[in-house]
């Protein structure tokens, strides 16, 4: 039952969050002078790249002075930072590992009112990032955090972090299918391929493939198959 599964996951997140705070594992982004864009991202304002844009646009102040130079270092222990006139408040870094069930969407805003992955965790004042996405009908591990720096390092293609997917396909997958995936399949945005693919398990009427991707596009695996 979807609702029972969601309730259990939410209870687990609450317990994990409480334990994390008791053990002192959740830390503030301040630990001496850091680059301004890194501080903003770590505080959950936006991704690192979006924070750089905010700085260049003159929307960030340090000690009541507008800062537009990227790489400027600040220390939240001794300096005040404002974004669009709103003071930046140090917040604990929070991490949730979620086993996303089917029927849940990873988008943070859903006009259709469907269950979102953000609904599975306790209410947090900090803005949470979904590191990677799975479509509504897929299930698997998703990381939610307000650590913008970590989110960027895990999700941005230039860091080369591979994501592993187990995909069940109808029938038996032969070597030709695996080779086609390795060489790349032409999609609307161009030719895309996998980092690695292998047959994990074979059933009478279906096959489980293990597929590794370095960069995930919208419903990429479904469209490739």
Predicted segments — roles?
Residues 1-16:
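Single conserved hydrophobic/aromatic residue that forms the stacking wall/gate
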Residues 19-225:
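Basic, flexible Lys/Arg- and Gly-enriched helix-loop patches that mediate nucleic-acid binding at interfaces
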């Amino acid at each position: 039952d979807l609702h029972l599964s969601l309730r259990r996951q939410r209870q687990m997140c609450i317990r994990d969050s409480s334990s994390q705070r008791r053990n002192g594992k959740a830390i503030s982004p301040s630990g001496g002078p850091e680059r301004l864009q890194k501080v903003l991202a770590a505080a959950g304002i936006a991704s690192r790249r979006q924070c750089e844009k905010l700085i260049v646009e003159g929307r960030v102040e340090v000690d009541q002075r507008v800062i537009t130079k990227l790489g400027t270092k600040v220390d939240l222990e001794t300096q005040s930072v404002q974004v669009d006139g709103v003071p930046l408040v140090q917040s604990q870094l929070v991490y949730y590992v979620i086993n996303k069930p089917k029927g849940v969407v990873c988008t943070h805003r859903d006009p259709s009112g469907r269950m979102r992955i953000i609904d599975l965790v306790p209410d947090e004042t900090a803005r949470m990032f979904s590191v990677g996405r799975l479509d509504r009908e897929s299930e698997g591990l998703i990381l939610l955090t307000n650590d913008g720096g970590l989110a960027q390092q895990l999700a941005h293609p230039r860091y080369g972090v591979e994501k592993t997917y187990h995909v069940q396909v109808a029938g038996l997958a032969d070597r030709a299918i695996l080779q086609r995936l390795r060489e790349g399949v032409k999609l609307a945005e161009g030719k895309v391929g996998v980092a690695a693919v292998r047959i994990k398990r074979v059933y009478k009427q279906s096959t489980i493939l293990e597929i590794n991707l370095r960069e995930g596009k919208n419903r990429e695996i479904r469209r490739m198959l």
